[in-house]
Regions:
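Phosphate/adenylate-binding glycine loop and adjacent helical scaffold
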Residues: 1-178, 220, 224, 278-281, ...
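Hydrophobic core segments within long, regular secondary-structure runs in both alpha-
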Residues: 154, 158, 182-185, 210
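Glycine-rich phosphate/ribose-binding loops and adjacent secondary-structure elements
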Residues: 163-203
Length: 289
C-alpha cells in the first residue's frame, strides 16, 4: 500500500467518482451505494476467470463498465443527459420518473438487463420517500443529524432505510451485516477526505472483499465450500455457508486493520486497497464472491 501511495485521497482519483466534495456529491454517493448490490450474472458461468462479454454493462464515454462501475457510469450518464437521478424529490415520484424511465437510465449495452432491476427500482422509490418525508429531501441532513459520529449515522441509515438493513438469523441469533451502510459512510468520509461533511470522530466501520482475502491467504474455504464456488452453485441467501463467509470476511478486516493501524492505515483505506486489488486482479481470482 505504501509503495502505491494509497491514501484517503485515492477515492476521488477515479474518473467516475465525484471530483468535488459538496452536497451534490453526497446525493450521488447515496444513490450509488443504495443500489450497490448483486451484479452476479449467469453468463459468467461460461468463463470462470473473466466476466462474459455478453453480461450486463453500461456504455459511457466510449467505454463499457460492469459491476459497481456500471452503476457509477449509468448515473453519470443520466446526469449528463439532465436527468436528476440523484435528487430524492425526483426519483421518489412515479409521475416525475416512471419505472420505464429508471429502466432507461440503467439500460444495458448488451441484451442482459441490470440484475435485480425491479428490486432496485423499489429501493429507489422507498429511499426517496424517506429522504423527502423525514430528512428534508437530502441525505446531507442525515449526516448533520449524526453529529460527526459514524456510529450515529450507521444507526440512522439502518433504522430508516430498509435497503441498508441487512440482517440474518444464525443458530437462533440475529446477526447484522451492515456492509453497504458502512460503505456509504466510508465513501462520504473518503470523498471529503475526513473534513466537513466527511468528518467522523469514530470512523472505524468497514467490510472486506472475501475473494481477494482468499487469494491473499487471509481467509480459507473448506473443500466442500470450494466445490460449490468452483461449480458456480448459487449459495442461498441466509444459508449457513453465506453467513459464515460474510462473518469471517468482517473478522479478517478487523484483524488486518489492527495490525496496520500503527502505520496510519485505517480499516476504510485497507478495504479500498483490497477492493481495488480484487478488481485489478479478477483474472487471477478463481473463486466467486
Amino acid at each position: 500500500m505504501k509503495k502505491t501511495k494509497y491514501s484517503i485521497s485515492s477515492w476521488k482519483k477515479n474518473e467516475l467518482h465525484p471530483s468535488i466534495a459538496d452536497n451534490k456529491a453526497i446525493d450521488w454517493i447515496f444513490m450509488v451505494d443504495l443500489l450497490n448490490f448483486s451484479f452476479w450474472s449467469e453468463l459468467d458461468k461460461e468463463i470462470q476467470s473473466n466476466p462474459s462479454s455478453e453480461r450486463f454493462s453500461i456504455e459511457y464515454n466510449n467505454n463499457r463498465y460492469t459491476g459497481y462501475w456500471s452503476l457509477c457510469a449509468a448515473i453519470n450518464r443520466a446526469l449528463e443527459d439532465e436527468i436528476p437521478i440523484t435528487t430524492p424529490s425526483f426519483y421518489m415520484s412515479e409521475k416525475k420518473l416512471t419505472d420505464n424511465g429508471i429502466r432507461h437510465i440503467f439500460r444495458s449495452a448488451t441484451k442482459e438487463e441490470m440484475p435485480l432491476l425491479d428490486e432496485r427500482i423499489h429501493s429507489i422509490r422507498e429511499a426517496g420517500k424517506v429522504l423527502v418525508e423525514k430528512f428534508g429531501g437530502s441525505f446531507v441532513n442525515c449526516i448533520t443529524r449524526a453529529n460527526k459520529s459514524a456510529a450515529n449515522l450507521l444507526k440512522i441509515i439502518t433504522e430508516n432505510f430498509n435497503s441498508f438493513r441487512d440482517e440474518s438469523n444464525f443458530q437462533g441469533r440475529k446477526v447484522f451485516f451492515y456492509k453497504r451502510a458502512q460503505i456509504l459512510i466510508a465513501d462520504i468520509w473518503a470523498c471529503f477526505e475526513g473534513k466537513e461533511l466527511g468528518e467522523f470522530h469514530d470512523i472505524d466501520k468497514i467490510t472486506i472483499v472475501p475473494q481477494a482475502l482468499y487469494h491473499l491467504g487471509a481467509l480459507s474455504y473448506s473443500p466442500s465450500l470450494l466445490n460449490l464456488l468452483e461449480s458456480f452453485t448459487l449459495i442461498p441467501h441466509d444459508s449457513r455457508p453465506e453467513i459464515e463467509i460474510r462473518d469471517n470476511d468482517g473478522d479478517n478486516g478487523s484483524s488486518s486493520n489492527s495490525s496496520s493501524s500503527s502505520g496510519g492505515i485505517n480499516a476504510i483505506i485497507l478495504d479500498y486497497f483490497i477492493w481495488d486489488f480484487a478488481s485489478q486482479n479478477k483474472h487471477k481470482l478463481s473463486y466467486g464472491f
